[in-house]
Amino acid sequence: MDDKEILLANPRGFCAGVERAIEIVEQALARFGAPIYVRHEVVHNKFVVDGLRAKGAIFVEELDEVPTGQTVIFSAHGVPQAVRSEAERRGLRVFDATCPLVTKVHLEVARMREQGREIVMIGHKGHPEVEGTMGQVGDGIHLVEVVQDVANIEVADPQQLAYVTQTTLSVDDAATLVAALRARFPAIVGPKKDDICYATQNRQDAVKFMAPRVDVVFVVGSRNSSNSNRLREVAELLGVPAYLVDNAEGIEPIWLEDKKRVGVTAGASAPEVLVDAVVERLKELGASSVRTLEGVPERVTFPLPRELQTPD
C-alpha cells in the first residue's frame, strides 16, 4: 500500500446561490407538498437532483410540461423573459431560484439595452445561464465563446457596445476575451465589477494554489456543471492530470499509480457528502492522511423568497 496524502482545496463545493436554490425546492415541497415542478435541473448535480426527485420534485425542460395551477421553480441558472411571461399568463405559482448574482447580470443587460447599446455576452453556447441572460432582451445581443468569435461580430455602432459574462467562466479565459473585445472595439463598456461570481473565482484560485502541491486532481462534480469543468481545466493548464468525477465510484485506481499527493476539490453544485465519499475511496486506494489547505473564508448567504422563509 503506498502512503498517499490527500490535499483538500479550500474553498470547494456549495456556493450561496446553490444552497439557496436547493433550499427553495425543499421548502416548497415542505409547504405545498409534492409534486413541485422545477424548470431545468435546479443545479447541475446528479446527486442533488436525484435526491430532490425522490422527495417529489419533477424536473421539466419546458413550462408546457407543468399542469395549470401547479407550482414551478426556476433553476439557479435563470430563465429568459419569455418563460416568466408564459408562467404569468398561465397563472402558475412561481418561485424563482435564480442565483442573485445571475439576476444582477440580467439587470445589467436590460439596463445596457435601454441605453441603446448592443451587448456582447461572453459564455458557453447552449448553457441555460447564457440562454436566460440573452433572453432578457429581444434583440441586439451577440454571443462570443472563443477569441475567433470576436472578429465575426457585426454591430450597428461600435461606440454603443457593452459586454457581460456568464458567472461560471474560467477567470483567465474571460479576461482573454475581454481583451480581444477591447482591442477590436475600444469604446466597449463592461460592468463595474466582473460578472464572474465570487465562488467561481475562489474555487479556481484554490485549485491554482493546490495544483503545484499535488500529482493528480479530482474534481467532484457533474459533467454538465460549467464551473466544475472549469476547475478541471485550471488544474490541467497547470500541468497536473485532472479528472471530473460524479462520485467515489468514478475514480479509476490506475489514475493514482505513482501519485503521492492527491488533490480534491468540488464544483459549486457538489455537496460535501460526495467529497467525503471520495476521500474514503482514496483511503481504500492507499491514502493515509488528509489535509485541508488554507483558503479564502466565504460568508455569503442569500435570503429565500419571503413566502418560503421560516420564522426564527
From Swiss-Prot:
| UniProt-listed Enzyme Commission number(s) | 1.17.7.4
Pathway entry: Isoprenoid biosynthesis; dimethylallyl diphosphate biosynthesis; dimethylallyl diphosphate from (2E)-4-hydroxy-3-methylbutenyl diphosphate: step 1/1; Isoprenoid biosynthesis; isopentenyl diphosphate biosynthesis via DXP pathway; isopentenyl diphosphate from 1-deoxy-D-xylulose 5-phosphate: step 6/6
- The kind of enzyme this is, by top-level EC class, is oxidoreductase
Name the active site residues: E129
Q: Which reaction does it catalyse?
A: isopentenyl diphosphate + 2 oxidized [2Fe-2S]-[ferredoxin] + H2O = (2E)-4-hydroxy-3-methylbut-2-enyl diphosphate + 2 reduced [2Fe-2S]-[ferredoxin] + 2 H(+); dimethylallyl diphosphate + 2 oxidized [2Fe-2S]-[ferredoxin] + H2O = (2E)-4-hydroxy-3-methylbut-2-enyl diphosphate + 2 reduced [2Fe-2S]-[ferredoxin] + 2 H(+)
Keyword terms of this UniProt record:
4Fe-4S, Iron, Iron-sulfur, Isoprene biosynthesis, Metal-binding, Oxidoreductase
Necessary cofactors: [4Fe-4S] cluster
Which amino acids does the record list as binding dimethylallyl diphosphate? H44, H77, H127, S225, S226, N227, S269
Q: Where does (2E)-4-hydroxy-3-methylbut-2-enyl diphosphate bind?
A: H44, H77, H127, T167, S225, S226, N227, S269
Q: Which CDD domains match?
A: lytB_ispH (cd13944)
Annotated binding of isopentenyl diphosphate, by residue: H44, H77, H127, S225, S226, N227, S269
Q: Which GO terms describe its biological process?
A: dimethylallyl diphosphate biosynthetic process; isopentenyl diphosphate biosynthetic process, methylerythritol 4-phosphate pathway; terpenoid biosynthetic process
* Binding-site list for [4Fe-4S] cluster: C15, C99, C197
Cofactor-binding details, from the entry:
Binds 1 [4Fe-4S] cluster per subunit.
Which molecular function GO terms apply here? Answer: 4 iron, 4 sulfur cluster binding; 4-hydroxy-3-methylbut-2-enyl diphosphate reductase activity; metal ion binding
Note the superkingdom of the native organism.
Bacteria
Recorded family membership: Belongs to the IspH family.
Q: Relate the protein's function as given in its record.
A: Catalyzes the conversion of 1-hydroxy-2-methyl-2-(E)-butenyl 4-diphosphate (HMBPP) into a mixture of isopentenyl diphosphate (IPP) and dimethylallyl diphosphate (DMAPP). Acts in the terminal step of the DOXP/MEP pathway for isoprenoid precursor biosynthesis.
List the HAMAP family hit by this protein, alphabetically.
IspH
Instruction: Give the protein's recorded name.
Output: 4-hydroxy-3-methylbut-2-enyl diphosphate reductase
Native source organism of the sequence? Aromatoleum aromaticum (strain DSM 19018 / LMG 30748 / EbN1) (Azoarcus sp. (strain EbN1))
